[in-house]
């Protein structure tokens, strides 16, 4: 039995407060590159067509919709999140895309997924594992929910190496991004973002965390000069 922590509740409330502008700000602040990152992540899941997929921290369903697009009519997606408002936006997007029947939404924390063992072919989480209060438990839950031979795919922000680009990006990430985000949204969500990324483990350490949780053959590769890292594990 898992009880929501104060941090769980705070994260859910924070994202609910920015839900109406979340997609707009994502496109603006990433210059649209986030769509490519999601395409690459979904391409790592199995099977290539059809299948059952779990999307943890589904939010406004960008990842769930990309799964439906790549995997075709035979695929089904279960999206879980703590923010009802974010999922409401996601449901509206799925309806507009004609995917209401293929994507189901459930309110649940990543630390306690309401599914039986081996229920899915693959599980993924995009830019959400940072926000899981008990990260190790969340990874174990994803592994538990995936069948043997399935994939666990994590897409997450990372800190670029200490190059000129890395220094430039860090300035943008820590100083510019929160200001732009603050103009279009209330609250501290875009101040929280750089803080949470800087506190996140380095890629080799997080890959080891995935192995400890139950993933085998874990790989990780940087995308867009290391702004984001794509992690893939086999259950």
Task: Explain the meaning of each model-derived region.
Residues 111-122:
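A short acidic, Gly/Pro-enriched loop at the edge of an enzyme's catalytic core
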Residues 213-235:
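Core SAM-dependent methyltransferase catalytic element
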Residues 136-151:
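A short glycine-rich, Lys/Arg-flanked "PGG" loop and its adjoining helix->strand segment in the class I
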Residues 1-21, 169-173:
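N-terminal, positively charged/glycine-rich alpha-helical extensions of SAM-dependent methyltransferases
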Residues 21, 31-51, 66:
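Conserved alpha-helix/loop element of class I SAM-dependent methyltransferases that forms part
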Residues 9, 155-209, 213, 219:
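C-terminal alpha-helical "lid/dimerization" subdomain adjacent to the S-adenosyl-L-methionine
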Residues 22, 123-124:
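Hydrophobic beta-strand segment of the Class I
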Residues 52-112:
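Class I SAM-dependent methyltransferase SAM/SAH-binding core
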């Amino acid at each position: 039995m898992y009880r929501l922590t104060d941090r769980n509740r705070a994260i859910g409330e924070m994202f609910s407060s920015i839900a109406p502008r979340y997609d707009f700000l994502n496109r603006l602040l990433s210059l649209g590159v986030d769509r490519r990152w999601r395409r690459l992540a979904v391409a790592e899941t199995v099977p290539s067509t059809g299948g059952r997929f779990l999307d943890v921290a589904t939010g406004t369903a960008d990842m769930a919709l990309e799964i439906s697009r790549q995997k075709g009519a035979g695929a089904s997606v279960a999206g879980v999140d703590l923010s009802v408002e974010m999922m409401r936006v996601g449901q509206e997007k799925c309806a507009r895309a004609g995917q209401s029947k293929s994507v189901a939404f459930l309110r649940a924390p990543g630390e306690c997924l309401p599914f039986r063992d081996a229920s899915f072919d693959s599980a993924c989480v995009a830019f959400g594992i940072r926000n899981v209060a008990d990260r190790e438990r969340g990874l174990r839950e994803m592994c538990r929910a995936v069948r043997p031979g399935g994939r666990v795919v994590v897409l997450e922000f990372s800190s670029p190496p200490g190059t000129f680009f890395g220094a430039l990006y860090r300035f943008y990430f820590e100083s510019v991004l929160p200001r732009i985000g603050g103009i279009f949204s209330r609250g501290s969500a875009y101040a929280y973002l750089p803080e949470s990324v800087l506190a996140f483990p380095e890629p080799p350490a997080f890959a080891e965390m995935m192995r400890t949780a139950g993933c085998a053959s874990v790989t990780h590769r940087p995308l867009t000069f290391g702004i984001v890292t794509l992690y893939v594990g086999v259950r």
